[in-house]
Design a protein with these regions (language model features):
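Segments forming oxygen-rich coordination pockets for charged ligands
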Residues: 1-152
Length: 152
């Protein structure tokens, strides 16, 4: 795996090392967007980053929100778009919209759930991570849960 393919692993390692970590994941895009849904950015409690959710155009704003999430332990959904004055101020001028889920590891994103994702990835087992934004319910989904998504 390249370093951009090991973002969950990096977030888990930072969390376990005691520096804290948050995981930011693109959960939706509309129009022209630099990164597709599923792209991730790991942010350490010290401000180190690995990965990308926007090709650099909103990473700074996402890092600020991730550090706040580490302080308050709460997840958040961030939205940036060209109709949003904030989008231009943080650099998203590509003509699209992007929606990003930020979760502090060990808080709303349980360490054992992230560890299960890392283990499945290492074993090359198909897996999806599902989050219901209303109520913040989380679960791992496999081929039996999403047969059309995980075809042979």
């Amino acid at each position: 795996m390249s370093e951009h393919d090991s973002i969950p692993e990096t977030a888990l390692a930072w969390h376990r090392a005691g520096t804290g970590a948050a995981l930011a994941t693109v959960i939706g895009t509309w129009g022209s967007a630099p990164r597709q849904a599923g792209s991730q950015l790991a942010i350490s409690g010290g401000g180190d980053i690995m990965g990308s959710v926007s090709g650099g155009c909103v990473e700074g704003a996402v890092v600020v929100e991730a550090l706040e999430a580490l302080k308050d332990g709460l997840p958040r959904v961030l939205e940036y778009g060209v109709s949003d004055d904030d989008a231009f101020s943080v650099g998203l001028a590509c003509g699209g919209e992007i929606r990003i889920l930020v979760e502090p590891v060990g808080g709303t994103l349980p360490e054992d759930l992230l560890a299960a994702i890392v283990t499945a990835r290492a074993a090359r087992q198909p897996l999806a991570y599902g989050v219901t934004l209303e109520g913040w319910h989380r679960r791992l989904l496999g081929p039996a849960d999403l047969p059309a998504r995980f075809r042979d």
